[in-house]
UniProtKB/Swiss-Prot annotation:
Organism for this UniProt entry: Synechococcus sp. (strain CC9311)
Major localization class: membrane
Localization of this protein: Cellular thylakoid membrane
Protein name: ATP synthase gamma chain
Record keyword Transport present: yes
Keywords of the record: ATP synthesis, CF(1), Hydrogen ion transport, Ion transport, Membrane, Thylakoid, Transport
Domain of life of the organism encoding this protein: Bacteria
Coiled coil start-end: none
Its job: Produces ATP from ADP in the presence of a proton gradient across the membrane. The gamma chain is believed to be important in regulating ATPase activity and the flow of protons through the CF(0) complex.
Amino acid sequence: MANLKEIRDRIKSVKNTRKITEAMRLVAAAKVRRAQEQVLRSRPFADRLARLLENLQARMRFEDADAPLLEQRAVQTITLMAVTGDRGLCGGYNSNIIKRTEKRFAELQRQGYKVALVLIGRKAISYFTNRNYPIQATFTGLEQVPTADEAGSIASEIFAEFLSETSDRVEIIFTKFINLVSCKPVVQTLLPLDPQGIAEADDEIFRLTTKEGRLSVEAGSAPENSQPALPSDIVFEQSPDQLLNALLPLYLQNQLLRSLQESAASELASRMTAMNNASDNAKELAKTLTLDYNKARQAAITQEILEVVGGSAAAGA
C-alpha cells in the first residue's frame, strides 16, 4: 500500500482538479443559457424572412426568375462544411462531427463527386490537415456565442464559390442541439437554397437554478412564435428578381448563423456534461483515496502499538 504522504498528495491533487472541473461546468452552464437566448431573440426575424421568401416563391411559381442562389445545376463539385470547436474537454462533440464528416466525404467520393472541405474550428482543421484532405477554406476564433458578422464572413466565402460555379452544392455538417444530454450531428444543404421555414416547434430552453446548494439546470419549453402571418395581398414595389437577389444572401447568412448557434450550444452543453461527470468522478475518487488513507493510517498506528507492546514484553522477559 502506498505510504501516507503519497495518498495525501493524491487526495489534494484530486480535490484541486475537482475545483477546476466544477468551475468549468458552471461557466459552460451560464454560456449555454446565453447561446439559447440568442437563438430565441433571432427567431422572429428568421421566421418572418422565411415567410417572405415563401410568399415570393409562391408568386413566382410560373415565372422565369433569375435568382443565382436558387439555381439547380448538374452537380460535379461539392463543398462540405464541418463545424467543430477550437478547444477540447467537451466529451465526444468534436470527434462525432469529424467522424460524420469523414463518412459523408467517403459517400460523396464513391458517388463520383469532387469534394472539398470548408472547416470551422481548430479541431477539424488539425485533424483533416494532418490527413491531407482537400481543404478549400478554414475559419477559427469564432465567439462562444456566434455573431451575424461571423456568419456573414463565412457565407460570403461559400456564396462566391457557388456563384463562380467552383462549387455546385454546399453542405454543412453541424451538431443539432436537442437537449443538455443529447446532441446529434446532422447534414444540411445550404446551397442551392430552398426556404422552408426555420423555427423548431420542439425546442427546449434551459434555466439556471440552485438545488441542494449546487447550481443545476432545468428544462422548459420554448415560447411559441407569435409573429402574425404575412397578408396575402401584400404589394412589392420591386420586381421579384430584385427582392430575391437581395433577400437570399441574407437568408443564407441566417441559416448559417443558426447552424453555428446550434453547434455552439451543443459544444457548451457537452462541455458542461463532461465537466459534471469529471467532478463526480473526482468526488468518488477522493472518497476512495480518503478511505485508503484512513486504512493505511490505522495500519501504521496498529503496527506502532504492536512494536511498543512487543518491546515492552521483550524488556520484561
